[in-house]
Each structure stands twice: as structure tokens, then as C-alpha cells.
Amino acid sequence: MMKMRWLSAAVMLTLYTSSSWAFSIDDVAKQAQSLAGKGYEAPKSNLPSVFRDMKYADYQQIQFNHDKAYWNNLKTPFKLEFYHQGMYFDTPVKINEVTATAVKRIKYSPDYFTFGDVQHDKDTVKDLGFAGFKVLYPINSKDKNDEIVSMLGASYFRVIGAGQVYGLSARGLAIDTALPSGEEFPRFKEFWIERPKPTDKRLTIYALLDSPRATGAYKFVVMPGRDTVVDVQSKIYLREKVGKLGVAPLTSMFLFGPNQPSPANNYRPELHDSNGLSIHAGNGEWIWRPLNNPKHLAVSSFSMENPQGFGLLQRGRDFSRFEDLDDRYDLRPSAWVTPKGEWGKGSVELVEIPTNDETNDNIVAYWTPDQLPEPGKEMNFKYTITFSRDEDKLHAPDNAWVQQTRRSTGDVKQSNLIRQPDGTIAFVVDFTGAEMKKLPEDTPVTAQTSIGDNGEIVESTVRYNPVTKGWRLVMRVKVKDAKKTTEMRAALVNADQTLSETWSYQLPANE
């Protein structure tokens, strides 16, 4: 009888322990808050020189053995693979698996990898550690696992949905971006990944962020699909005051496009991961800011309260706009951030950095709060990031949007029908949208336009575009001082009804 009681008690204790134990963001937050109260310890590299000094071509030879993917022997649709350290990925991160009853460290082993022609001493790498990880999921076909998430380097992560290829990146946090003091790059130093059940359609990842002046706890819930959505919860703590905090940062690349054509002959009409910043302001206004590759660092700030969303988008999916069979810019996703709750007063900020080639990410966008708490106090931000190729879904259906911005030499048609340049710059902006397409072509659509002190609008005309079933704005402007930037805004209206988002363009200096 006593034995039966003991067994019953043991079973009850096991059930109670299993049901009550659960890993959560609060467990990570305790570590982050504890770190914030201590001095920063820079990560130490344990990387042998053969890996630290290798070239990119050599690093590419180190491949994960797909047959050894983590969870390969489980029926879960998600699998994990890991990145080896090498080049500037020279600091290990800890990766843990969270099960229903415990947390287990996923240990590095060189047996996970094939090294190609890279010569190395096996004894020097046996305890090396991983540089990061990737998540695989049968997103495009049921019998094939495709990579959908990559977490590698600082606090960067890339995500794609069905039929997409990697393009822009998201980050956990940005600090002092574009400030003279220099940017600080926080890094995820440890991850906890929940083991999914066979029927799970989402994967939960926790991360501990650390940097000289900030720490943070993050929870990412990845929901793969045609649009892959990542639900993000973050708890951030400052060690010291910072000049600027970038929340939900997105990083992309813009080299050239029709608003800023390539200075050299190139068979590709456009080359970019994103071509504009879209903002849904707290007051309901939609704003579209075409991207530039300026000759000097450019920072644009859009002040508002409680933003409803922002993102770096790739508008225009026709292959003919890119003509690149290797890099398939037409398949790269847009990323849209939707805040949860009220974020208060602050700005959506856009940073554009000069670059000579497509290998450098030169575009950054993020939310920066006006007020930051004292060091040690907790900041909470919740939001989703949608990675999509369906830009129509990322905009209000009753509001027309900018399909494309083209830049040209301004001219005037002479009596002999020959066009004569007149010293102006012309911008041709096509607007389209589901509701706009329903309007009769004789609708008296006009434009509300404005320009900053450094320019003058010489002419502004709007006409129906029968090809797009939208309206085309042509605006000729004269710049007063080419060494300064020139700001322009335009929106289409019908009497007192606003029909479109606001086109907000900055002509870079020395263009």
C-alpha cells in the first residue's frame, strides 16, 4: 500500500513538474538585466588563424552536412543547421534546445561539417562553437526542406517566405547609427530554440543580446508561409546612455534604379534589395520615400506618435526591371514592421550610405524613440515583421500608391516638336491602386505638391495612364544649389479627397 502511494505521489510530482516548468522570455530577461548591471565583457575569439584569415571562397567550402541536420530523426517539419566560424564570423554563440522538461546545450562538433580543401588541425576545432544557425522548413514543396531563417553575425537575421530568395536583413537593435561617434553593433550571444512538435507550424526562438551599452531579451516566433511572419517581443536594458536607439531595424541595399540611374552602362536597369521606405504614420498618412545611393551620408527623419507600420519594400516585381538571372532581385522580399501597442513619440529614420557596389548594405531604417529611460530600466517593444512579395497587401486598399519613380532631364517641346532641355530635372511618378483603377479616366485628378527652400517647381501636370489605369504626375523642378539636398512632396487628390499616399523624395546633393 505504501509503495502504491509512493508511486502515485511520484507520478503526480512528475506531472506537476512537467506542466509547471516552461522556458520563457522572462528567463532570458533575468540574464539581460543582470548583464546590464555589470561591466561589459567583450567576446573572446577562439578561432585558429587558418579560419580567421581565410578568404570568402575558402569559407564557402565549409558546408554543413545536411544528413546531420538537428531534429533530422524527429518528425518535426523544422530542422536546424549551423554555421561554422570563419573570416569575420570569429566569435562563438551558444545555442540551446528547449524541450518540455529541460534546456540542453547543442554542442559543436566538426563532424557536422565538410571542409573541402581547407586544411585544419582537428584538435584545435573540437570545442570551437558555432557562428550561428539556420532554420529549414518545407515551404515550397512537401518533400524538400528549404532554408527560411538565417541568424548569423551581430544581431542580424534574414527571413524568407515561399518563392523568395534572401535579400534585406532585420536586426535585433541598432545603436547610434549614422552618429559621428560611430555605430555600436549589439550581438546575440546565446540562443534557446524550442523543439517543435510534429504538428507545429511555428518555431519559437529566444535570444540574449549584449553590447557595451545595452542588453536585451528577445522572443521570435517564426510562422512560415507564402508570407513568413516573425512575431517579435523584446525587453531592452541600457548599461549606459546612448545617443540614439534604433528599434526594429531593417538593413538593405540600393545601388541604382530609375530614380537614380547607373552612372555606367549596365544591362541591369535596376539593382537593389529594396527601392523605397513605406511608412504608415500614427495620424493615418501613408508616405513613400524612394531610396537613393547618395554621394554623402544622408539621414531622413519622419517624426510621429504611435506609428502604425513601416518597412523597406521592393515595389515592382517584373523580371524585366532587373534582368539578373544570378541574384534574382525580383524574388527578394519586402519587410514590413507592424508595432503592437503604443510606441509613443519618436521618428522613423532612414539612413542612406554611399556605396560603389552591391556587396555593401547601405540602407538602414528603424524606429527611434524621443525619450529613453535611465540605464537599468526595462523597455518593451512588441511587433511583427512580415516578409512578403505581395506589396499590395502592405498598403491600404483604398489608397493609391507609387508604382515607380523615374528621373529625367527636364525639357520643353518646341514649335518644331523637338524637345529642348531647359535646365530642370523632371520626375515622372506613376500612381496606381485598386480603388484608383475604378475611377473614370476623366476624373479631375490633380496634385498637391511642395518643395523645400533649395528648389522651385517649374511645372506640375497630372494625366491618366491607360496602361496602368492609374495617373501619372510629371514634375519639373529647378535646383538652386546643387551642393545641397532638395526635398519634394506630392500627393494626388480629387477636390478635397486624398487619393494617394504622399510621395516624399529627397534629391541628393551633387546629383
Curated annotation (Swiss-Prot):
One of its GO terms (biological process) is beta-glucan biosynthetic process. Its main location: periplasm. Pfam families: MdoG (PF04349). Keywords: Periplasm, Signal. It is found in: Periplasm. Pathway: Glycan metabolism; osmoregulated periplasmic glucan (OPG) biosynthesis. GO terms for cellular component: outer membrane-bounded periplasmic space. InterPro entries: Gal_mutarotase_sf_dom, GH-type_carb-bd, Glucan_biosyn_MdoG/MdoD, Glucan_biosyn_MdoG_C, Ig-like_fold, Ig_E-set, MdoG_OpgG. Residues 1-22 form the signal peptide. One of its GO terms (molecular function) is carbohydrate binding. The keyword Calcium does not apply. It comes from the Bacteria. Belongs to the OpgD/OpgG family. Involved in the biosynthesis of osmoregulated periplasmic glucans (OPGs). HAMAP family: MdoG_OpgG. This is Glucans biosynthesis protein G. The gene is mdoG.
